[in-house]
Amino acid sequence: MPYKIPISALVLVHTPDLRVLLLERADYPGYWQSVTGSQEPGETLEQTATRELAEETGIDAAAHGGVVDWELSNEYAIFPRWRHRYPPGTTHNTEHVFALQVPEPIVVRLAPEEHLSYLWLPWAEAAPKCFSWSNRQAIEELPQHVNAERRER
C-alpha cells in the first residue's frame, strides 16, 4: 500500500441552524470527528474534500452547492500509532478546512471500515466531543463563518 500524503482535508457538514455531523471512528471507538482524509496524488484540495465526503458519508457535495474552502489550514503532529501510514520520517500533517451546508440532518451511508456510527449535534455540543483539537477549533469557528457567508449574500 502506498504511503499517505501528509496533506488532508477536514469537511464540516452542517445545517443552516448549525447542527454538525460527527462520525465515530471504527479503529478507535469513542473517537468522534468530522469527515477527514488525505490528499491523493494529482488531486486539488477541493477534490480531496469532495471525494472524502462521498466515500465516508455518501453525500454528493455538488447536490448541495459544493464544499466551501475556509482558506484555513492547521499543522498537527501525526499520532505515533498512525505514522507508519506516511513516508518514513513524516511527523506532521497539514489539514485544510472545508464546509458543506445541507438543508437538514440527512441520513448518511457510512463506510463501515472507517466509521461505526454518526450523530447530528448542535455545534456547541459537537465541538467538545471531537478528539482532534483542530476539528474542535473548526467547529467552534463555524458560527462566525456561516454568519460571514450570510452577510456576503
Where are these regions (language model features)?
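Conserved N-terminal beta-strand and adjoining loop/helix that marks the start
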Residues: 1-20, 41
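General beta-strand recognition
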Residues: 19-22, 33
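The catalytic Nudix box helix
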Residues: 34-71
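Short, well-ordered beta-strand micro-motif
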Residues: 13, 24, 99-101
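Short connector loops at helix/strand junctions that flank enzyme active sites
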Residues: 6, 29, 34, 65, ...
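Short, basic, low-complexity termini and linkers enriched in Ser/Thr/Gly/Pro
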Residues: 148-153
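Active-site segment of metal-dependent pyrophosphate-handling enzymes
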Residues: 59-106
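NUDIX/MutT-family hydrolases
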Residues: 96-139
